[in-house]
A protein has these predicted regions:
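Active-site-proximal beta-strand/loop segments in catalytic clefts of secreted hydrolases
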Residues: 62-64, 87-91, 114-115, 151-155, ...
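Secretory targeting and sorting signals
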Residues: 1-35
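Conserved, mostly hydrophobic/aromatic
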Residues: 63, 77, 86, 110-113, ...
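C-terminal domain-boundary segment and adjacent tail
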Residues: 45, 49-52, 80, 93-94, ...
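Loop/turn elements at helix/coil->beta-strand transitions in domains of secreted/extracellular proteins
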Residues: 55-57, 80-85, 105-109, 145-148, ...
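Alpha-helical scaffold elements lining the catalytic groove of polysaccharide deacetylases
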Residues: 118-146, 154-202, 213-216
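Low-complexity, acidic Ser/Thr/Pro-rich repeat tracts that form intrinsically disordered stalk/linker regions
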Residues: 29-47
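Active-site beta->alpha N-cap acidic-glycine motif
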Residues: 41-138, 239
Length: 251
């Protein structure tokens, strides 16, 4: 069954990766370094080549990376000339900064998925903001710019989360369908689930830290192409004016 982000938050709890990452003992207070021109240029998402108001589009999104299987996923996306959106965890970007740069360089979109993958509504205001702002700074150092999109871990959100995101210039992105790939752990079933959830203007939630998901993507891309879909980033799918700071997409 398609799980929609406008449903009760209880549904969202099963949609994201299993465990929160442990915070290090101290948060970094270092200011963001100035990005080189090359890094800043590589961080710009590819311009939309299609008008999703006129053609059939879908956005594949991947949470919780970068991880050990992200490079293979990027190889597959490049081979099939498909774009995707990656919601990255700040702590993991620090561990795999080159992968984050590659995601940006190859024209995919990058979003903020918090620093340590905690449920944001459960945090006091300062810690909630720190989870997002620290990741903004990590990504600024890694790819030369701060993202404009965020996705709350587990899909847990409320008015405080949206307000904090808005103050940091971030729009919230949820989904129209989740594969529950982290629990399925089966290549065929994950692929079948994506294809069942696919619909025009859909936003599909997956995880590039799940190896079976990465293995499923070649078949998914081939089948979606056969169905006439353009594989685009969330921003290309949303179009102008729908991803303002503090906004939530899809509605």
């Amino acid at each position: 069954m398609v799980k929609r982000p406008v449903a009760a938050l209880a549904l969202a709890a099963v949609a994201s990766a299993p465990a929160a990452l442990a915070l290090p003992a101290q948060a970094s207070a270092a200011p963001a370094a100035s990005a080189s021109p090359a890094a800043a240029a590589s961080a710009k998402p590819a311009a939309a080549r299609v008008d999703c108001a006129k053609v059939k589009c879908i956005a594949l999104t991947f949470d919780d990376g970068p991880g050990p299987y992200t490079a293979r996923l990027l190889d597959t996306l490049k081979k099939h000339k498909a774009k995707a959106t990656f919601f990255l965890v700040g702590k993991r970007v620090e561990e795999r900064r080159k992968l984050a740069r590659r995601i940006a360089r190859e024209g995919h979109e990058i979003g903020n998925h918090s620093y340590s993958h905690q449920s944001l509504p459960a945090l006091p205001d300062f810690e909630l903001t720190e989870e997002l702002s620290r990741t903004q700074d990590v990504l600024r150092r890694a790819i030369g710019r701060r993202p404009r999109l965020m996705r709350p871990p587990y899909g847990h959100t409320d008015a405080r989360v949206r307000a904090a995101a808005g103050r940091l210039g971030l729009a919230q992105v949820l989904w129209t369908g989740t594969t529950l790939d982290w629990s399925l752990r089966d290549t065929r079933r994950i692929g079948d689930t994506v294809l069942r959830l696919a619909r025009p203007n859909g936003v599909i939630l997956m995880h590039d830290v799940v190896p079976q998901t990465v293995k499923a993507i070649p078949r998914v891309l081939r089948e979606l192409r056969k169905r006439g879909y353009h594989l685009v980033t969330v921003s290309a799918l949303a179009g102008p004016g729908r991803l303002a700071p503090g906004a939530s997409f899809p509605r």
